[in-house]
Amino acid sequence: MFAKAFRVKSNTAIKGSDRRKLRADVAAAFPTLGTDQVSELVPGKEELNTVKLYAHRGDAVTVYVSGGNPILFELEKNLYPTVYMLWSHPDLLPTFTTWPLVLEKLVGGADLMLPGLVVPPAGLPQVQKGDLCAIALVGNRAPVAIGVAAMSTEEMLTSGLKGRGFSVLHTYQDHLWRSGDKSSPPSIAPLVVDPADLNDDKESVQVNPVLQGEEEGNGETALSEATSAGGQDQDPTDSRTLQEQMDELLQQCFLHALKCRIQKADLPLLTSTLLGSHMFSCCPEGHQLDIKKSSYKKLSKFLQHMQQEQIVQVKELSRGVESVVAVDWRHPRITSFVIPEPSLTSQSVQEGSREQPYRPPDIKPLYCVPASMTLLFQESGHKKGSVLEGSEVRAIIINYAKKNDLVDADNKNLVKLDPVLCDCLLEKHEQHSIMKLPWDSLVTRCLEKLQPAYQVTFPGQEPVVKKGKICPIDITLAQRASNKKVTVVRNLEAYGLDPGSVAATLQQRCQASTTVTPAPGAKDSLQVQIQGNQVHHLGRLLLEEYHLPRKYIQGLEHAPKASKKK
């Protein structure tokens, strides 16, 4: 809405009676704000102005300005917060996350398409169509845009995260933001994401039509056509229609999830979680579950049918959000359901993994030469992208200093900095003040300027070099319904661990239910969920039995504290 310049009609100070009305409107529009917070937003005596303007499309908008920054705007009698206001109240709206690469498109007036979303470990926030939402970037929870949800969370998951997700109204760096002090978003609770995922998703944004701008009216149609073409094709050997095949697959995944993945302790269970975390993971290899291609079209309609068969009971525990509250595990359809056998390939892999005990990989830190450091390394025959060990970097620095006669004659522990070393190792403000550096500082600065990489060598396999830092095994505690705690562990595959085997071992050790589900926001990765706080058992398994170094495991501090004996 504010991607282009707007025209200001008037700018007036707000009177006392209008301030009181605005406070009441803010409290009604954002009920989660306390009285003190509302009073802080709409102060009694400080400067507060009303700016009436026309957006570039002709929309009449009223903007409320406090302390020189726009904090609210009103459109068609609806109040919306600006990014300036959301930076002080980041949890005011349900927040969805996207990639930093996407922001430029949003600022240019594009709407956010669902393929551009990053799904956090806790799942997507629960919203209904038309709800006001905030949009943040990976690495920072501070909102950079606000928009209106084009569909509910359930519909987003049912669609397989395809289509238009949010109609964007206002963004950081648009013309409304420019009318304020132009401050940058604060750093709030950064999200941890696998660098490999970030690179993969950047490539997907460039290739796929994730965003649809104002001029691209037919972008969503093209996207839906592309996804339909790449979806599940009808089996030519099956005489049934695609809809009939999808109905059977839907019921198979549903019954499989109830029989193997869901425990009584998991109830009540959000219907969106049932689909996203359980049913999708029960889909057989080579098939794709798409409810829209079934006769039910929507998950809610399918669950109504299952409720009529008295398999489950579904209730709306909060407005617009349905949950499965009861399951009849003695129902004939569940008891008679036969779990599909895995493929021969997966069976042989699992059997082979049982024969040999787990041995941890050898992980060696490496360094890549970036473009900014090529001048320093080209004398030794290296170029941009060359991968080096730390000892090699140290040797190259020493040889460079000696070859160019940079060792200080009066103090052999110091190295004089020539123009190449200055450009490569010093910050701009240091280049006129630092003329010499000790050897250790010289090498340390060089290592910090290089890009991280690592080499993983599994027993009996060839070494594999990857860019970025290896993601540690991540252990977190999450709160589920009725204040029940669960332990969630991710990134096991990076260390050659099979999540299914780890889950089975923990189930026996902890005497607690375990589930293996797709890790939200991580491509082709699984996470293990264990009932209760099982960090202590998990730590013993990883450290003492699997012999993984402690530095590659994060979250061990969440283990319950030992009770003191009286």
UniProtKB/Swiss-Prot annotation:
Residues 211-239 are annotated as: Disordered. GO terms for cellular component: cytoplasm. GO terms for molecular function: RNA binding; translation initiation factor activity. It holds the Pfam family Pre-PUA. It is found in: Cytoplasm. Residues 365-449 form the SWIB/MDM2 domain. The modification Phosphoserine is found at residue 343. Its main location: cytoplasm. Residues 473-546 form the SUI1 domain. Residues 93-173 form the PUA domain. GO terms for biological process: formation of translation preinitiation complex. Keywords: Acetylation, Cytoplasm, Initiation factor, Phosphoprotein, Protein biosynthesis. Gene3D superfamilies: 3.10.400.20, SUI1-like domain. InterPro entries: EIF2D, eIF2D_N, eIF2D_SUI1, Pre-PUA, PUA, PUA-like_sf, PUA_eIF2d-like, SUI1. Translation initiation factor that is able to deliver tRNA to the P-site of the eukaryotic ribosome in a GTP-independent manner. The binding of Met-tRNA(I) occurs after the AUG codon finds its position in the P-site of 40S ribosomes, the situation that takes place during initiation complex formation on some specific RNAs. Its activity in tRNA binding with 40S subunits does not require the presence of the aminoacyl moiety. Possesses the unique ability to deliver non-Met (elongator) tRNAs into the P-site of the 40S subunit. PANTHER family: EUKARYOTIC TRANSLATION INITIATION FACTOR 2D. Belongs to the eIF2D family. This is Eukaryotic translation initiation factor 2D. It comes from Oryctolagus cuniculus. The gene is EIF2D.
